[in-house]
Swiss-Prot record:
Function: Bifunctional serine/threonine kinase and phosphorylase involved in the regulation of the pyruvate, phosphate dikinase (PPDK) by catalyzing its phosphorylation/dephosphorylation.
Coiled-coil parts of chain: none
Reactions that this protein is recorded to catalyse: N(tele)-phospho-L-histidyl/L-threonyl-[pyruvate, phosphate dikinase] + ADP = N(tele)-phospho-L-histidyl/O-phospho-L-threonyl-[pyruvate, phosphate dikinase] + AMP + H(+); N(tele)-phospho-L-histidyl/O-phospho-L-threonyl-[pyruvate, phosphate dikinase] + phosphate + H(+) = N(tele)-phospho-L-histidyl/L-threonyl-[pyruvate, phosphate dikinase] + diphosphate
Keyword list, A-Z: Kinase, Nucleotide-binding, Serine/threonine-protein kinase, Transferase
Enzyme Commission number(s) from the entry: 2.7.11.32, 2.7.4.27
Residues that bind ADP: 157-164
Similarity comment text for this entry: Belongs to the pyruvate, phosphate/water dikinase regulatory protein family. PDRP subfamily.
Protein name: Putative pyruvate, phosphate dikinase regulatory protein 1
NCBIfam families per record: PRK05339.1
Organism: Staphylococcus haemolyticus (strain JCSC1435)
Length: 276
């Protein structure tokens, strides 16, 4: 260590927030990257500030230690107190929230929530959505059955009744969805029938409608359009089997013929608890 470094004054930064303080912390770290030669930096966090006495104690400590105060406080009274104290005691004070809130409110004529931790709430919603998508991908098309009881809903139906698109649409809204294709020759595992309280939705459509979709799908894949997959009699047999499964699972039946994914999802959501 050279003499310059040893004599370098410690830069002290206080992060004060009525939530976790991650917004100010990110801003400070982003700013400090502009000072790569600055090594003696001390950052202290004071999260979840709820009363003015506690806030004043922190401001007094900042005054004594010659610290810069960076805040993300939603409370107008806290912000007013902080600005006043900093002005009276010559404390370097950065308010990351109130100025921008005021400007956006003025420009848009919209009322802010004035809610602490709104970003964290948004992040929580994001991670819940990711978790739901990961679950729904894992349990798509009958790939897994082990934790199927964790699903918010189970969707069953024959091929080309929109099971996967509907599952992914609902997953993006925070719902964990499992879906199982119904094929007469392949039995559904017993543990699926034993699930208690699992909401089940059976997707169906007319034989001719499904046949047309399957024919188009086969042609897209470069397969023969005249195959067992899109044979009308075969599809009728699959639908009879599907009806039997719907009854066993006490499924709510949805006819997806000429329905958009949004329409079917809207109907299913009426039976589910709101997620996000």
């Amino acid at each position: 260590m050279n003499e310059t470094q040893s004599n370098e004054q410690i830069l002290k930064l206080f992060i004060v927030s009525d939530s976790i303080g991650e917004t100010a912390q990110r801003m400070i770290h982003a700013t400090l990257t502009q000072f790569p030669d600055l090594h003696n930096v001390e950052i202290k966090k004071f999260p979840y500030i709820k009363d003015e006495e506690e806030f004043l104690n922190i401001l007094n400590l900042a005054r004594e230690q010659h610290a810069i105060v960076a805040t993300t406080l939603v409370s107008e009274s806290f912000n007013a107190l902080g600005h006043q104290f900093a002005h009276e005691h010559d404390i370097p004070y950065v308010d990351y929230m109130s100025d921008l809130i005021s400007i956006i409110e003025k420009v848009t004529h919209s009322q802010p929530l004035m809610e602490s931790g709104a970003l964290r709430k948004l992040n929580d919603e994001y991670f819940k959505r990711i978790e739901a998508i990961e679950y729904s991908v894992k349990y798509d098309d009958g790939k897994h059955f082990t934790d199927i009881g964790e699903a918010d809903a189970l969707i069953v139906g024959v091929s080309r009744t929109s099971k996967t698109p509907l599952s992914m649409y609902l997953a993006n809204k925070g719902y964990k969805i499992a879906n199982i294709p119904l094929v007469p020759e392949i039995e559904i595992p017993d543990n699926v029938y034993k699930q208690k309280g699992l909401k089940v939705f059976g997707l169906t459509a007319s034989p001719q409608y499904i046949a047309n979709i399957r024919k188009n799908r086969a042609e897209t894949l470069g397969l023969s359009s005249e195959s067992r997959y899109n044979n009308l009699d075969r599809i009728k047999k699959e639908l009879v089997y599907a009806e039997e499964v719907f009854k066993k699972l006490n499924a709510t039946v949805i006819n997806t013929e000429y329905k958009s994914i949004e329409e079917s999802a809207f109907y299913i959501e009426k039976f589910l608890q709101p997620k996000l």
